[in-house]
């Protein structure tokens, strides 16, 4: 997971910079294309070339599969080119996707639209996207030792949750009442990120990541990741597997046989770890910019990969073919951090949308289109910056108010801010 960049604009900047960093390995095709388009957008806008700026914004819109951020960018270019009707259509799409961003709309490029009656009407509709909605309740609040809780999973045999902490650099074991004990500390003292419980084999898989530029990790280690296997009963570290160079293995799912599938939100790779040999195999062909938590499908051949920037993709594990699920101008599919599949239902934690939200999508079968969506939680005092979740029985449990939004890009507290009290929320999803 690109853990420092919750808002999509920040992700764009961070990944563009990473693609140009001299010590980075050759960029995968998607990151390279993204960097080129981002640079071209800046160049054409600064030069005042309205036609070239519009053409590039259209290319970016296509590349990002009609994401909300790309819609706003294209709206800006259409307004700049004097195409008010097209710009207002794009604005209506942005709002139809449940988005609201008053700050972005203060940009000078939108000045020609503000006095138009249709703009005012759409702007009024946008305000409704800020209204609070919730079908969730607080299960327990996390203790202060859970400093930036990141991932969560559950062991049905012991009825315990396991929660990774970024600044705490720990995995915590928590019961349904919120009673907490230390399960394991990061062996390299890097932030603990992804985790998954393999209840059948009685092991827990996790990752620790020395995020680039992150003060909580030694500078000499920046850009390194490790996949860790623990004995679930004792907390003993069984294996430590060094990740690929310059990879941030921040998100994880388990294949049917228990093999971890991990994603690198910094450089675009999706990998499978062989649980027996500890070998690492790349699963994708470079189509992703910032892949997050994959969802393994029942057929064993496909996984759904949420790209924080490009949206939601179906990846064929045999051929590496990627098919993007269309937004159809109605569904925000970018900005997903955690993704969880239940037959044709997807549960997503979206901390890269505006506003942030937890949402349920219903897909067709096969999974090629979104049929409907419904909000689980949005714009509430309890939600804050949500990260990941886990389905337990009929309920979805998820981390809310994680605290990422009060940290700067180096993982230090923003001036005047303090870490919030994080919670585990619960909503019925079946």
Predicted regions mapped to residue ranges:
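A short beta-strand motif characteristic of beta-propeller blades
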Residues: 136-143, 179-185, 236-242, 278-285, ...
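Beta-strand-rich domains and repeat architectures in extracellular enzymes and scaffolds
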Residues: 130-172, 420
